[in-house]
UniProtKB/Swiss-Prot annotation:
Function: Responsible for synthesis of pseudouridine from uracil-54 and uracil-55 in the psi GC loop of transfer RNAs.
Protein name (record): tRNA pseudouridine synthase Pus10
Species, as recorded: Halorubrum lacusprofundi (strain ATCC 49239 / DSM 5036 / JCM 8891 / ACAM 34)
Enzyme class: isomerase
Family: Belongs to the pseudouridine synthase Pus10 family.
Single GO BP term: tRNA pseudouridine synthesis
Family annotation (InterPro entries): HSP_DnaJ_Cys-rich_dom_sf, PsdUridine_synth_cat_dom_sf, Pus10, Pus10-like, Pus10-like_C, Pus10_THUMP_arc
Catalytic residue positions: 240 (nucleophile)
Amino acid sequence: MDVLEVAARATGTGPVCDACLGRLVADRSFGLSNAERGSALRTSLALRDDEDYEPVETADCWVCEGRCTEFDEWAERAAEAVEDVEFATYNVGTRPPPLIEENEALLREEAGLDDDAGEPFKSEFNREVGKRFGRLTETEVSFDRPDVQFTIDLAEDEIDAKVNSTFVYGRYRKLERDIPQTEWPCRECKGSGRQGADPCDHCGGSGYLYDDSVEEYTAPVVEDVMDGTEATFHGAGREDVDALMLGTGRPFVIEVEEPRRRRVDTDRLQADINAFADGAVEVEGLRLATYDMVERVKEHDAAKRYRAEVAFDADVDADALAAAVEELEGTTVEQYTPNRVDHRRASITRERDVYEATAELDDARHAIVEIHGEGGLYIKELISGDEGRTEPSLAGLLGVGAEVTALDVVAVEGEDEPFEREEFFRE
């Protein structure tokens, strides 16, 4: 249908403002606002029909009920809602009153257009408010994961400002044993610290099995510096509570909810964390990251290197140890869920590869064993056999009982590519 005929039918329904008129043909001619399209149509229609040009005040429009005059007002209200928040990107969404949606559907019908012709009122409102907000705050629109997100409810005359999480990536070393990665609630009282009216005997009333954690040494510092409401620790797997995490450290991301600050000095933040942890934990390589880095550390396949101090139940000679280790190297191990974790892991048999294995005797009853293995390989059970649940094992190959007395993780690296990818970091 000819656009002037569309305009004639639309304006014949009553007072229609330029924006609502132009929205009917929003897919025609780029570089114009809908108000400019509508004004051009109204002018062309007057010229075609040789009639007086009669502009329509937006406040009198029966379609939007004057809402198209409010773009500036809502942009200013949005800016006020986040005036004490640091952000670089934003997005705007709108809930229009049902009557306006009904009005614009009726206008399309009267103009002889399909239901999906042109552009919805909601889309224009989002864009026009967003453009003005961007100019006011000197920030950029984002349709992916903006720093701040607004929902305008026109019927309720309300604006909701959501400040999305920010993320800090790094690697940590755990330099003391008996520190879990994250808080470990007591199984007996389920973290309440109580058994009925009395303090829980199992955890001493604290609600936790351990006093400290890597999370507690790191996340509160980041939350405080970024002035957030809560911080969550995401690790690339986790070492045993009694194991050290040394070498290159383990990748992690700390997510801070509703941060008021995003542009922080990561070198200073790193120093603050290390000072707070006081030698129990240390972090390095802190960088501002995107949400994608959370998925990366949680899902990326990782290989691990371990150093284990091993005690044998009987004397072992160097040749026998070397032969057993050589047989382990390059093999695929079958591990049924270990006894020590079967209360919290599914009872299945897992296959894991041993990439490299070396060992050196300290004396006939003690050795240092180093293993490079696939992620998810249970090292303690690879040494002990776990009552036959792991095959093959060092103990089984030697025919001698073996136990890990101290375990260190010395490297956590991506299987096929590094954890760190530049597109997952922010400036």
